[in-house]
From Swiss-Prot:
Name of the protein this chain belongs to: Hemolysin
Location in the cell: Cell outer membrane
Gene name tied to this protein: shlA
Signal peptide stretch: 1-30
Keyword presence, Membrane: yes
Origin superkingdom: Bacteria
Organism annotation: Serratia marcescens
Residue ranges, compositional bias (Basic and acidic residues): 478-488, 716-726, 977-996
Biological process according to GO: killing of cells of another organism
Length: 1608
């Protein structure tokens, strides 16, 4: 047996205790009215007005009176019963008289039995006095009322046990084995009927019953019968038997009842009924029990103060405090006009208010719930004083709900009878009908409500920023409390298992029926909100730095569930129906069924989590900034199932719609019966998991190349990181204004949508899919930098300072993918049925009239959008500086001031002799490298069918991939067993690698009597790959034509058939292709490079050293292929019909009528190919050596050196381009072929126009070729450099020895060569023409034109063997050469031009600027040898013999003129080459740089080999053909020009072709000096050329001829 414990609030417990105490003490006071002993006792009297009086017994004769007692108590001066037979007054015993025991008979029942052993105690009132009767008090030893009542009653009974009386009648009451109590407390009053019959009722105050008028304006009414356990009752509280009990008694009603019928029964069996506070019935309110409990009243309140400037000491204190807490409620009201609470176990309503007009709540478990109340606040303050502190505490908590209210005013029934119906945040209403019925489940939830807040605290030295630490905040907020059902006309939820909605609100304003017998769950409740921040600080205790934090946030909310009607919405269940993100509507339509499983219209999801764990710092709390996080977001709620009329979803397993919305507004019907229809998308996710940190000091001002600069300061430490995962997509929709989907397995769209807003759409099943949906991102990102600092340098190559460091690391990985599509949008016709397979993937549709696909085949595909990236980089640094360099005097005076603004003067005397000197030193380097990059991408997404008719049926393949049909108002029909239209691509790839290097060292002075170390390094690796491919194509356009009709093959790839305003028909039965579509590209590179070097040093007086080495290799490769084509159009013509073969590849066929290409084996028209390729390869190297030494006190010597360097490069190019096909027409062009080979009609460079032409090939022949474009090059180049140096020098003595005849020897050699060769082979023709104005060539083998051209105004046909008209050629061979040589020698002395203009005064004044530039170049070569010996002694007269005197300070000597002797000098040739061009222009300005050089060569050659179009058969009103064997011609032509050429008698055979065209080349440039052959013959005569060679040639003659001309 179940025990129910009724929990009282603290106030309730106090009230109960007081009632017991009062009852006990009042019992002591009320021990009065005793009677009994014989003939049923009474007498008893007191009055004047301590009331009592009684007198009654006598009647029976069934006016019963039957009193007995031994005790019975009343007091507070009440009682009187008398029942009169006159005298008068009373209202508690004023005056009185009559009774003596009523021999003349009144009564009509007054019983009062007790018969000893106490309780009764009633503490006031009872009167009857004259006539009106019915009153019973029976006792077995309970009853205590306290303020009790009655007076002249019309039926009041309080019983607790016994009388039944039989033949003297009464016949009611017993309560069998009895366990006492009926206890009421304060105010009872009564009037018409009140029976409270016990074991156990304990009511606790106010029971007021009224109505009762009589004497005899009869009324009575107002009733209360509250009967509790053991029973056998009647008189007419009926019950008539029951027993069981030992233990569990319950029944208290805990304050107030009024009446106009209230009838509360508890007939034990686990007992029950406890209500609390007011039942009011203005007509009927019944409660029956084995449990029913209804609760309210929670009081509680509290507070707690302190303050008033609390204090402690020693030197510091204050602690403030306020606290509070409270709850209050007092509700429970049940009013009346038919309310019935029945429970035969449970029925539990907690914060109750139930009003009335029909309301039945039953039991066997039914719970409407609520209550929880708690409010509490807080506040503490805490402060302290020495070494300051300040604490704070704040709290707050509210959790509130209250729940339950059922208000009907016309029907509402909530029943369970055996288990469930719970409503929780309830509020049920109705204004005629609402019914919830269970016997397991029906759930509907709600409640929650919270609001918490907190703050903690503690700081210590507090502020002016001596802050110290600890803090904590929190904030939590949830709310909800829903659950509402409301009616105003019909609403039924019924279960038998399940129906559960959670964020409920269910409304109907007629019809809303939810039925179940397993399932229907219309979801979501969830709520949360939270926040937390922690703080941790420090300022001066962290010497000015601090901060940490520990943030958080969490937010889920979802709530929905709203089912609303306004007319029809029926959801049925029977093992299915789940709507989760909720809302379902009706407004006169709906019905969702799932009789035996399926249907789920999903989404909800809500998560937000943010965590961060920050930190700042600096100064000695260092860090300065960090941030972690652990983000996560999902959201989405959708699910809306609507109708503003018609919506039917039936299912018997499956039929999911997941991102949701299903609407209507006129028929939408979705069915499954048994299996599938899924219309998906939804998935939502985002995780990011960040880390950040930074410590930065900065500074800087940059550019540290070319003209140089840099500034400085930098400390850096950065570390970022991110992980990202993102998956979005939400869609899903099926709308209405007509849509029908039916399955019996399959029908899937995935990125979703099918709308049809006002007219047609239907999709059936066994596989139909429209697919896509992706949206993805995944990412890893990392960055690490470490850092370093200090710097300044300066400009145009150095000033100084240094120190740096480095390290950097970047990683990126990313993937992505987008696509989401699926489609349609209709508004008139769309029919897709497939009883196996129709799959579209990039689908979009949008219809607007017809578009139908019926299947067992059909694919349409594409869809992609994706991307991928991998980037990795690692770098190192290091640098140490100090400087002044002055880059060997500022880059030889910035390359001799732009080679003196390009007038050059031999590289402004070789950049002023390479200047040289300043330096101070130290640089140590190091760099780093490594990198990787990969990238990939792919777009495409196609499929699209816009419509206004398109019709595709298949029972075997139709597969497009670059699809897009569009047909806006008319045709495109395709019936199949094959048709395939491929293309679609868009891809790009890329890979790379980069590995670098470098090193350094430079230690220098010039001159701190010297030292040099120089060393270098370098590194290598590069690699790269790339690839690309576009194409996408596809399309069939139409507005009124195209009609493909296939039973095997018809394959297009560069597609686009148009059909505008009529016809384009393709009809296969084997083959028809239109191929090509390409766009490709590829590339690959590779690398390597290495270098090294070293240098050496010392002087006072010198040593040197050198070294070198080098590196190279590189590779290449490239490729491409473009073409695309496709296109065939309409305007009432074009028909292609095959039946095996018909291939166009360079397609583009137009029309304004007729064009028919047929086959039955082969018709070809090929070409279209485009391709290019290029290869490369490089190899290079160099080597340098060196040595040195010298000695001095005056000289010894040394030196060696060498050089090197070569590079070899090779490229190998190629190209092929052909295009071909294009047929135009403005009337007839028919090319037919019917097999039997020799190439049953085949055109290759085709063009064909129209206004008639028909080339057939009745069983073999016709070729008409060309189109061949090729090109090839085989380029290479070679470069060689060399060098050498030399040395030796002796002298010494005056004790330093070495002389051996005092050496010298010095040299500088050179060399050099560059050769570049480009070769080429080229072949070109394109021909095939046929232009028309009549042309017919039939063949039955042979007819072959090979380059081709038929022009026409007539040319007729039949060949039947031979007729070749050839021509072709076009060949070009190429060669193009460039050579650039060199040569040099020197024999040093600074390789003068006066030792390179004596290095403009440095190293240290360069021999006093080479003795003032060799004394004004020997005083301008002795005043130009005395004005060229006074103009060669006036143009010779045997010339004067007196020479000039010259002086050289450097050699300390005077040179006198030579004394003539012997023969006189030879005279003119003019004057011996103007005395060998001015002493070779004064030994090319004073001294060595002996022999220099150059030679440049260019050459071109082309070769050609001719024709360049001919081939012909022309026409202009003649040529009739009928050949039947031979005609040949080879150089071409058969012509007419206004008449004749017939060839019915054939033979003819002519040849001619020959050809030629040649071009030529030349050019050499020379010098190896005499002023660079006088300034490159004044720069090749200021670039009008010729001096020093040239050339060219040309040859033509091109022939082709051959013949038959007639009318010419």
């Amino acid at each position: 047996m179940k025990n129910n414990n009724f929990r009282l609030s603290a106030a309730g417990k106090l009230a109960a205790a007081l009632a017991i105490i009062l009852a006990a003490s009042a019992g002591a006071y009320a021990a009065e009215i005793v009677a009994a002993n014989g003939a049923n006792g009474p007498g008893v009297s007191t009055a004047a007005t301590g009331a009592q009086v009684v007198d009654i017994v006598a009647p029976n004769g069934n006016g019963l009176s039957h009193n007995q007692y031994q005790d019975f108590n009343v007091n507070q001066p009440g009682a009187v019963l008398n029942n009169s037979r006159e005298a008068g007054l009373s209202q508690l015993a004023g005056q009185l008289g009559a009774n003596p025991n009523l021999g003349g008979r009144e009564a009509s029942v007054i019983l009062n039995e007790v018969i000893g052993r106490n309780p009764s105690l009633l503490h006031g009132q009872q009167e009857i006095f004259g006539m009106a009767a019915d009153y019973v008090l029976a006792n077995p030893n309970g009853i205590s009322c306290q303020s009790c009542g009655f007076i002249n009653t019309s039926h009041s009974s309080l019983v607790v046990g016994n009388p039944l009386v039989e033949n003297g009648v009464l016949q009611g009451y017993s309560t069998f084995g009895n366990r006492n109590t009926l206890s009421l407390n304060g105010t009872l009053n009564a009037g018409g009927v009140l029976d409270l019959i016990a074991p156990k009722i304990d009511s606790r105050g106010e029971v007021i019953v009224q109505d009762f008028k009589q004497s005899n304006g009869k009324v009575t009414s107002a009733a209360i019968n509250a009967i509790s356990g053991l029973n056998r009752v009647a008189r007419d509280g009926t019950v008539q038997a029951s027993q069981q009990m030992p233990t569990a008694l319950d029944s208290y009603y805990l304050g107030s009842m009024q009446a106009g019928r209230i009838n509360i029964i508890n007939t034990a069996q686990g007992s029950g009924v406890k209500l609390a506070g007011s039942l009011n019935a203005g007509d009927e309110l019944k409660v029956k029990a084995y449990d029913i409990r209804s609760e309210s009243r929670v009081d509680d309140a509290s507070s707690n103060k302190n303050g008033g400037d609390n204090y402690q000491n020693y030197r510091g204190g204050i602690y403030v405090n306020d606290r509070s807490s409270s709850q209050t409620l007092t509700r429970t009201e049940l009013k009346g006009k038919n309310i019935s609470l029945v429970a035969d176990n449970h029925a539990h309503l907690t914060a109750t208010d139930i009003r009335g007009e029909d309301i039945t709540l039953q039991g066997g478990k039914l719970t409407l719930d609520g209550q929880q109340l708690k409010q509490t606040q807080g506040h503490t303050d805490d402060r302290w004083f020495y070494s300051w502190q300040y604490d704070v505490t704040r709290e707050r908590e509210q959790l509130q709900q209250a729940g339950s209210t059922v208000a009907a005013s016309g029907s509402a029934k909530l029943i369970s009878t055996q288990e469930d119906v719970k409503l929780l945040g309830a509020n049920v209403s109705a204004d005629r009908a609402l019914s919830v019925k269970a016997a397991r489940d029906v759930h509907l939830a709600g409640l929650v409500e919270k609001d918490k807040s907190s703050e903690r605290g503690y700081q210590r030295n507090h502020t002016s920023s001596l802050r110290t630490g600890r803090w904590s905040n929190s904030d939590e907020s949830e709310s909800l409390k829903a659950s509402e059902l409301r009616s105003e006309g019909e609403l039924t939820l019924k279960a038998g298992r399940n129906v559960s909605t959670q964020g409920a609100k269910v409304h109907a304003q007629r019809d809303l029926t939810i039925d179940a017998d397993n399932q229907i769950q219309v979801g979501v409740q969830k709520t949360a909100n939270a926040k937390a921040v922690r703080d941790d600080k420090t300022s001066w205790g962290g010497i000015g730095g601090g901060d940490n934090k520990n943030n958080s946030n969490r937010r889920e909310i979802s709530h929905a569930s709203e089912l609303t009607s306004g007319g029809t919405l029926r959801l049925n269940g029977q093992q299915g129906v789940t709507i989760t993100g909720s809302k379902a509507r009706g407004q006169k339509g709906g019905e969702v069924t799932a009789t035996h499983g399926g249907l789920r219209i999903d989404n909800a999801l809500s998560t937000t989590v943010d965590k961060i764990d920050a930190r700042t710092g600096t100064a000695f709390n260092i860090t300065s900034s960090s941030h972690k996080a652990d983000n996560s977001y999902q959201s989405s709620t959708a699910s809306e199932l609507k109708s503003d009329t018609n919506l039917t979803l039936v299912s018997h397993k499956d039929a999911d719609v997941i991102g949701s919305q299903v609407a209507s507004g006129g028929e939408l019907s979705v069915e499954s019966k048994t299996g599938n229809i899924n219309v998906k998308a939804a998935e939502r996710q985002q995780n990011i998991d960040e880390q950040k940190t930074a410590l930065t000091v900065n500074g800087y001002a940059k550019e540290a190349g070319d003209k140089q600069y840099r500034a400085g300061l930098r400390i850096e430490h950065t570390r970022d990181s991110e992980k990202t995962t993102r998956t979005e997509n939400s869609a899903s929709s099926l709308s209405g204004g007509s849509v029908k989907l039916k399955a019996e397995k399959d029908v899937t769209f995935s990125g979703s949508k099918l709308v049809a807003d006002k007219g047609d759409a239907s999709v059936s099943g066994n596989k139909v899919s429209f697919l896509a949906a992706d949206d993805k991102t995944a990412s890893n990102t990392e960055q690490t930098k470490i850092g370093g600092g200090f710097y300044y340098t300066g400009g145009i190559d150095k000033l100084g300072s240094g120190v740096e460091a480095g390290y950097e690391n970047n990683k990126t990985q990313a993937q992505s993918s987008k696509a989401i599509t699926s489609g349609s949008d209709v508004k008139g016709n769309l029919t897709i049925n497939a009883r196996d397979k129709l799959t579209q993937q990039g689908a979009q549709h949008s219809v607007g009239g017809a578009y139908q696909e019926n299947a067992a085949g059909v694919d349409h595909l594409a869809a992609a959008d994706t991307a991928s990236t991998t980037t990795t980089k690692t770098d190192v640094g290091v640098n140490i500086g100090a400087n002044v360099d002055y880059s060997a005097v500022t880059r030889p005076v910035e390359r001799a001031v732009g080679k003196a603004a390009k007038l050059d003067a031999t590289g402004v005397i070789n950049d002023i002799g390479g200047i040289g000197a300043p330096n101070v030193g130290l640089d140590i380097g190091a760099q780093g490298g490594s990198s990787e990059k990969r990238s990939s991408s792919s777009q495409a997404v196609v499929s699209s069918v816009q419509a206004g008719s398109i019709d595709i049926n298949a029972k075997g393949e139709v597969r497009d991939q670059g699809t897009q049909y569009q047909a806006s108002k008319g045709a495109v029909n395709l019936t199949a067993d094959s048709h395939r239209s491929e293309a679609a691509a868009n891809r790009q790839d890329e890979q790379s690698r980069d590995t670098r290097g470098s090193a350094g060292v430079r230690v220098y002075t010039t001159t701190g009597s010297d030292l040099t170390v120089d060393a270098k390094g370098e590194g290598g690796t590069q690699r790269s790959n790339s690839s690309a491919s576009q194409a996408v194509t596809g399309s069939i356009d139409a507005a009124n034509g195209i009609n493909v009709n296939v039973k095997k093959d018809a394959i297009y790839q560069g597609t686009a058939l148009n059909g505008g305003r009529g016809k384009t028909a393709v009809n296969a039965g084997g083959d028809i292709r239109l191929d090509q579509a390409s766009d490709k590209q590829s590339e690959s590179r590779s690398g390597f490079n290495v270098k090294a070097s070293a240098k050496g040093g010392f002087t006072a007086d010198s040593k040197n050293f050198g070294a070198g080495f080098g590196g190279g290799t590189h590779n290449g490769e490239s490729s491409s292929s473009t073409a695309q084509v496709g296109n065939i159009s309409g305007q009432q013509g074009v028909e292609l019909k095959a039946g095996r073969d018909l291939t166009l590849q360079g397609t583009d066929v137009k029309s304004q009528g007729d064009v028919s290409l047929s086959a039955g084996n082969k018709v070809a028209l090929q070409a279209a190919e485009s391709t290019q390729t290029r290869k490369e390869s490089k190899l290079s190297g160099n080597i340098d050596l060196g040595a040195g030494s010298s000695d001095s006190k005056e000289k010894t010597g040394g030196n060696l050196s060498a050089g090197g360097a070569f590079d070899i490069a090779k490229v190998n190019e190629s190209a092929t381009e052909r295009q071909g096909a294009t047929i135009a027409s403005d009337g007839k062009v028919t090319l037919s072929a019917n097999g039997k080979g020799d190439d049953a009609l085949h055109l290759q460079g085709a063009k064909v126009s129209g206004g008639s032409a028909a080339l057939e090939a009745k069983n073999g022949g016709i070729l008409l070729e060309s189109a061949k474009n090729e090109q090839h090059k085989d380029n290479w180049s070679l470069g060689i450099k060399a060098n050498a140096k030399g040395g030796q020098t002796f002298n010494k003595d005056a004790g330093g020895k070495v002389d051996p005849n005092t050496g010298k020897d010095t040299h500088t050699l050179g060399a050099g060569l560059k050769v570049g060769v480009e070769q080429q082979d080229k072949t070109t023709h394109a021909n095939t023409g046929i232009t028309a104005g009549d042309v017919t060539l039939n063949s039955g083998k042979d007819t072959r034109l090979a380059g081709a051209r038929v022009d026409a105004d007539s040319v007729q046909g039949k060949v039947g063997g031979d007729l070749h008209v050839e021509s072709r050629k076009d060949v070009e061979n190429g060669v193009k050469v460039d050579v650039d040589a060199g040569l040099s020698h020197s024999n040093d002395p600074g390789s003068s031009i006066t030792s390179k203009l004596s290095k403009v005064g440095t190293p240290r004044y360069a021999g006093k600027v080479k003795e003032k530039l060799e004394a004004g170049v020997n005083k301008v070569a002795d005043a130009t040898t005395d004005k060229y010996n006074s103009v060669a002694r006036r143009l010779d007269p045997q010339q004067d013999t007196t020479g000039a005197v010259s002086f050289s300070k450097a050699e300390g000597k005077v040179t006198l003129p030579a004394t003539p002797a012997g023969e006189k000098p030879q005279g003119p040739l003019w004057d011996r080459g103007a005395r060998t061009v001015g002493g070779a222009v004064k030994d090319s300005i004073t001294g060595p740089a002996g022999r220099q050089g150059h030679l440049k060569v260019n050459a071109d050659v082309v070769n050609n080999n001719a024709v360049g179009e001919q081939s012909a058969i022309a026409g202009k009103n003649g040529v009739a053909l009928q050949v039947g064997g031979q005609t040949q011609l080879t150089g071409g032509e058969i012509r007419s020009q206004q008449g004749k050429v017939e060839l019915g008698g054939s033979q003819v055979s002519q040849q001619d072709v020959n050809g030629q065209r040649y071009q030529g080349g030349g050019r050499v440039d020379a010098a190896a000096t005499v002023g660079g052959l006088l300034g490159g013959a004044a720069k090749q005569s200021v670039a009008g050329n010729v001096p020093f060679a040239s050339g060219h040639a040309s040859t033509q003659q091109a022939d082709a001829k051959a013949g038959v001309f007639s009318g010419k």
